[in-house]
């Protein structure tokens, strides 16, 4: 059983890594996670990861026990694009408390979440070694989170989110693929950089001392590796993903 005293004694990072180690699949992970979080008076949790690309329809992965009808609605409405907790997670690793003010620019999202018993909560961003962003969301139907409680929860949620991201990445094949780095050769990186600077294939060929066909060959490989249909999209994705 989850004990606050044990977490404080071991340190929250060590504690959550140790209890998550018991889980052999996502069902077991969810049970262990809920047992811990219900001691903190939360009814629901979701661990979400949003792909950087494609820009207009990013892939969203959600794990936990959020109501299924809400998850389906969130995906169908593409709420990840306007969710302020997702936007926050891209620029900060600090937790953020839900409030009417936070969701003032997306009232439909906030209203529908409340209708699904997700009334009071917080979001805790975390980052893995590939720089991918995950967001842990904790929610409950009743009892607003006071500022004092929020402060006390900060070290707990930070440790939980980091351990959860590592465990989910180990268990789920789609997330492992999502977290896999694309490997570009040195020549491909040069082609990407020169293209980003506005150079044509002919100009890049002159600069690099190769023929235009060779540059175009590198472009095709880059597009295949990064999942782009043309070189403009390839450069945009490469910049967004931090490859150049």
UniProtKB/Swiss-Prot annotation:
Record feature DNA-binding region, as residue ranges: 201-220
What cystine linkages occur within this chain?
none
Keywords from the named record:
Activator, Antibiotic biosynthesis, DNA-binding, Quorum sensing, Transcription, Transcription regulation
Residues in HTH luxR-type domain copies: 177-242
What GO molecular-function term can you cite, just one? DNA binding
Pfam families per the UniProt record, alphabetical: Autoind_bind, GerE
One of the GO BP terms on file: quorum sensing
Function description:
Positive regulator of phenazine antibiotic production. May activate the phenazine biosynthetic genes by binding to a DNA sequence upstream of them, or to an intermediate gene which, in turn, interacts with them.
Q: Which family does it belong to?
A: Belongs to the autoinducer-regulated transcriptional regulatory protein family.
* Name of this chain's protein: Transcriptional activator protein PhzR
- Gene of origin? phzR
């Amino acid at each position: 059983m989850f004990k606050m005293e044990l977490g404080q004694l071991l340190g929250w990072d060590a504690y959550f890594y140790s209890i998550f180690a018991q889980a052999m699949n996502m069902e077991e992970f969810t049970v262990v996670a809920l047992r811990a979080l219900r001691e903190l008076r939360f009814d629901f949790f979701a661990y979400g990861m949003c792909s950087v690309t494609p820009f207009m329809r990013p892939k969203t992965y959600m794990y936990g026990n959020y109501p299924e009808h809400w998850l389906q609605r969130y995906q169908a409405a593409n709420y990840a694009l306007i969710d302020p907790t997702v936007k926050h997670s891209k620029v900060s690793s600090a937790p953020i408390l839900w409030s009417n003010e936070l969701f003032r620019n997306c009232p439909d999202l906030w209203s529908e979440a409340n209708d699904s018993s997700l009334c009071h909560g917080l979001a805790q961003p975390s980052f893995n070694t590939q720089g991918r962003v995950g967001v842990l969301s904790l929610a409950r139907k009743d009892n607003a989170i006071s500022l004092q409680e929020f402060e006390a929860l900060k070290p707990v949620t930070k440790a939980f989110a980091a351990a959860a991201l590592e465990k989910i990445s180990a268990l789920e094949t789609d997330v492992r693929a999502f977290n896999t780095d694309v490997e570009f050769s040195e020549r491909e990186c040069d082609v990407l950089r020169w293209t980003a600077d506005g150079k044509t294939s002919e100009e890049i060929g002159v600069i690099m001392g190769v023929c235009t066909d060779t540059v175009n060959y590198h472009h095709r490989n880059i597009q295949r590796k990064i999942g782009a249909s043309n070189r403009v999209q390839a450069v945009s994705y490469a910049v967004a993903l931090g490859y150049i």
